[in-house]
């Protein structure tokens, strides 16, 4: 459980699913004004109701629609559609606030596309949007901080990933989208992007759904360069990642 003084909410971070490569491990969150609850997700579901029938055990189907999913399986592919990054079964998490840096982090272990049960610990930065929900920076932490970005930093071709509620071994769907300097979005979906309510916050509207979050300058370790990412969440609690392409 993590308290945020700015939102005045307590956040309950959870892992759903099984931790092996086929278990569909994923990280979710719920919040409450009181440390002892009751906790609800972004859809208003009470987390105390997240359970299977009496006598059941590991009933993923019964609980899959509880908890706001922050991150699950996703594969970053290259131009030949070969996975070169991303995570499989990220979970077993801890959320942490660094008072000195005034930054929030989430620490978890993860497996990787096409690498079986090999696993490592990862640290990603957390940000809170104007709806009071945390969003996870799509790439591992490398010292980045939020800052105002120029239009040319944001515009470009992206890979986007929409998190669904499934608890399975499938990857989240990858969408190829282009963000233009005139704030339009097109490709495997359409919409626009704009500034939002909080400092440095942005909204990306995709197929009539608004995702509030942040464009972030992050280190792309696969290609060894800095790139722009986006992490946002809809009012219904659907998380969206975007990673700007950097390869030639």
Residue ranges with predicted function:
Residues 1-248:
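Carbohydrate-active catalytic/glycan-binding domains of CAZyme proteins
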């Amino acid at each position: 459980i993590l308290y945020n003084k700015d939102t005045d909410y307590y956040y309950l971070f959870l892992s759903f699913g099984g931790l092996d490569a086929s278990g569909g491990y994923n990280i979710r969150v719920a919040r409450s004004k009181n440390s002892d609850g009751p906790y609800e997700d972004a859809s208003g579901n009470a987390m105390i109701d997240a359970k299977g029938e009496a006598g059941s055990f590991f009933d993923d189907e019964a609980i899959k629609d509880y908890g706001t999913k922050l991150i699950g399986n996703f594969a970053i592919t290259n131009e030949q559609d070969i996975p070169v990054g991303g995570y499989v079964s990220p979970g077993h998490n801890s959320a942490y606030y660094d008072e000195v840096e005034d930054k929030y982090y989430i620490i978890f272990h993860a497996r990787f596309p096409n690498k079986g049960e090999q696993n490592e610990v990862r640290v990603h930065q957390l940000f809170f949007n104007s709806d009071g929900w945390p969003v996870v920076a799509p790439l591992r932490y490398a010292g980045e901080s939020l800052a105002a970005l120029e239009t040319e930093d944001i515009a470009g071709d992206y890979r986007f990933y929409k998190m669904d509620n499934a608890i399975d071994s499938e990857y989240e769907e990858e969408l190829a989208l282009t963000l233009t300097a005139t704030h339009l979005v097109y490709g495997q979906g359409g919409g626009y992007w704009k500034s939002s309510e909080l400092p440095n916050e942005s909204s990306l509207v995709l197929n009539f759904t608004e995702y509030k979050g942040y464009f972030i300058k992050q280190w792309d370790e696969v290609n060894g360069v800095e790139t722009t990412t986006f992490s946002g969440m809809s009012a219904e609690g659907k998380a969206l990642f975007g990673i700007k392409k950097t390869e030639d």
